[in-house]
Amino acid sequence: MAVTFQHTPVLLTEVLTMLAPRPAGQYLDATVGGGGHALAVLQAAQPGGRLLGIDADPAALAATAARLQAAGLIEQAVLCHGSFADLATLAATAGFGAFDGILFDLGVSSYQLDTPERGFSFTADGPLDMRLDPTQGLTAADMVNRLSERELADIIFLYGEEHAARRIARAIVEHRRTQPFQRTAELAEVVARAVGGRHGRIHPATRTFQALRIAVNQELDRLRATLPQAVDLLAPGGRLAVISFHSLEDRIVKQFLRAEASGETPRLTIVTKKPIVPTAAEVANNPRARSAKLRVATRIG
């Protein structure tokens, strides 16, 4: 059964407060998703505001286009299919110059998590895919069936911060000798057996699935590649806002902002000395928001 592209924008009020969209401003949503943030920013930037929306997932772009069309704002937006690692090229091709605000929402959408066919979920069986862009690159099945035990252990430990990484990698390699992995439920079961059951609130496969998703989509490498481009594209006084969902992303963002705000010729001023997190009310309404952290900086110049 098809799942409608539903994704509740996280920290929406806080994002609008921090970006402070103004009429005739130019804005970039580098992870446009279902268009929740994009629509709110574009509405606040009228009259005359424009928005460039980028996403690796064609389904996300279609959902955003429909949302902006319904709001009568599609003519004020340009939507591009691609990776935010190519931010500068995509912006130039779309005819945008300096931006007054740039947003990254690094979370996987509810649509992607809740659509078994996308292969992100360990709670609903589907093909073991995990690609944010289904037209590009290796799938998670390719990785677990081809990589060495050591390579798998390194990925699961580094990207999932999973202490049972070696045990999980060994179990994966043993299983695939007789039956290559094809389905998410199959991998989740093997991982759960290797870990030895649930520990606390999270499913035993949570960290392994996170690690594979990061590896499949080269998420951390692409984040490191895009952040300097984002600063280059900001107008003086423009703001960069980044929402992260796990410690690996947040560490990269935090260290990058600190580096850009220091030295002889700093390019940024940090606005959020500590990250902004969701209110208890937002988490109650949208439990997937609970780990979100928003960091913001302003372009000097």
From Swiss-Prot:
UniProt-listed HAMAP family: 16SrRNA_methyltr_H (MF_01007)
What does the record give as EC number?
Answer: 2.1.1.199
The record's Gene Ontology biological-process terms are: rRNA base methylation
- The entry's keywords: Cytoplasm, Methyltransferase, rRNA processing, S-adenosyl-L-methionine, Transferase
Alphabetically, the GO molecular function entries are: rRNA (cytosine-N4-)-methyltransferase activity
**Looking at the keywords, is rRNA processing present?**
yes
Q: Which Gene3D superfamilies match?
A: Putative methyltransferase TM0872, insert domain, Vaccinia Virus protein VP39
Q: Which family does it belong to?
A: Belongs to the methyltransferase superfamily. RsmH family.
* Name used for this protein in its record: Ribosomal RNA small subunit methyltransferase H
Q: Does the keyword Transmembrane helix apply?
A: no
Cite the InterPro entries for this sequence.
Answer: RsmH, SAM-dep_MeTrfase_MraW_recog, SAM-dependent_MTases_sf
Specify which residues bind S-adenosyl-L-methionine according to the UniProt entry for this protein: G35, G36, H37, D55, F84, D105, Q112
- Role, per record: Specifically methylates the N4 position of cytidine in position 1402 (C1402) of 16S rRNA.
Gene this chain is encoded by: rsmH
Which catalysed reactions does the entry list for this protein?
cytidine(1402) in 16S rRNA + S-adenosyl-L-methionine = N(4)-methylcytidine(1402) in 16S rRNA + S-adenosyl-L-homocysteine + H(+)
Gene Ontology cellular component terms for the protein in this record: cytoplasm
Localization: Cytoplasm
Organism for this UniProt entry: Chloroflexus aurantiacus (strain ATCC 29366 / DSM 635 / J-10-fl)
